[in-house]
Amino acid sequence: DIVNHSSQLIIDLKTTNNINTFASSAHKFNYDSQAYIYSKMFNMDLIFIVVDKKTHQLGLFDCSDKFLQSGQNKVALAVQAYNDFFVNGDGDFSQYYISKTL
């Protein structure tokens, strides 16, 4: 990740198997949460520069308000889960993991 103070911009370099599906992958891999946290920490916009692993095509993806709001919602849920487990001591861990023998 690069923080460009003169341009007030955070640049995150990512790779993908398919640049045409990067937008959905960004939600799947919680890049919306990352973008929200970084934008709050540094008070700067964030862009993703994406390289397709197969074609080497480049993509530049900025973050919409909707994308950042999605990240904010996910972060709020994570904070609530943390508080439930570690602050309040009343969380139910069983909903967050699976335990099996291989």
Which residues make up each language-model segment?
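Conserved catalytic cores of phosphodiester-cleaving nucleases, focusing on short active-site segments
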Residues: D1-A23, Y38
